[in-house]
Amino acid sequence: MTAGRRMEMLCAGRVPALLLCLGFHLLQAVLSTTVIPSCIPGESSDNCTALVQTEDNPRVAQVSITKCSSDMNGYCLHGQCIYLVDMSQNYCRCEVGYTGVRCEHFFLTVHQPLSKEYVALTVILIILFLITVVGSTYYFCRWYRNRKSKEPKKEYERVTSGDPELPQV
């Protein structure tokens, strides 16, 4: 096995994993995701651990969380205030559809129905594709038949061995 082939086999498994990690990192950076603790089933949601990435510290760290003090009740606009014990900071657990440091940004997802022009264009392109496939198949079949009919047929002749002792077939 050559060195290039070995390197290709090693990279084949690692490149998709690296791209996946890069995709998650970019998704977090672009959407400015907030802290979403993942409590273990049976663990109290008032005191569990979460993976947190802050603007000041881009590393992901595991921290303990508790509820915020009563004076921080209005801190989160659309979510629940949580206190990160290990970092001594307040963060928000946003409601579904909200994001941001204080859950102030709303994700407005609008699903627009397909326009008639888009549907018509799609149908036309599919029909053109099918016509191309059928036409190519027809052309190939005719070419193959013409080529086969133009070849002279090979007729087999009886060949004798020339040896009188051998039986002739």
Curated annotation (Swiss-Prot):
The keyword Disulfide bond applies. Interacts with EGFR and ERBB4. Residues 60-119 are extracellular. Residues 1-29 form the signal peptide. Disulfide bonds join C68-C81, C76-C92, C94-C103. One of its GO terms (biological process) is female meiotic nuclear division. Residues 30-62, 109-169 form a propeptide. PANTHER family: PROEPIREGULIN, TRANSFORMING GROWTH FACTOR ALPHA. InterPro entries: EGF-like_dom (IPR000742). GO terms for cellular component: clathrin-coated endocytic vesicle membrane; extracellular region; extracellular space; plasma membrane. One of its GO terms (molecular function) is growth factor activity. Keywords: Angiogenesis, Cell membrane, Developmental protein, Differentiation, Disulfide bond, EGF-like domain, Glycoprotein, Growth factor, Membrane, Mitogen, Secreted, Signal, Transmembrane, Transmembrane helix. Ligand of the EGF receptor/EGFR and ERBB4. Stimulates EGFR and ERBB4 tyrosine phosphorylation. Contributes to inflammation, wound healing, tissue repair, and oocyte maturation by regulating angiogenesis and vascular remodeling and by stimulating cell proliferation. In normal adults, expressed predominantly in the placenta and peripheral blood leukocytes. High levels were detected in carcinomas of the bladder, lung, kidney and colon. The chain crosses the membrane at residues 120-140. It comes from Homo sapiens. Glycans are attached at N47. This is Proepiregulin. Residues 64-104 form the EGF-like domain. Residues 141-169 are cytoplasmic.
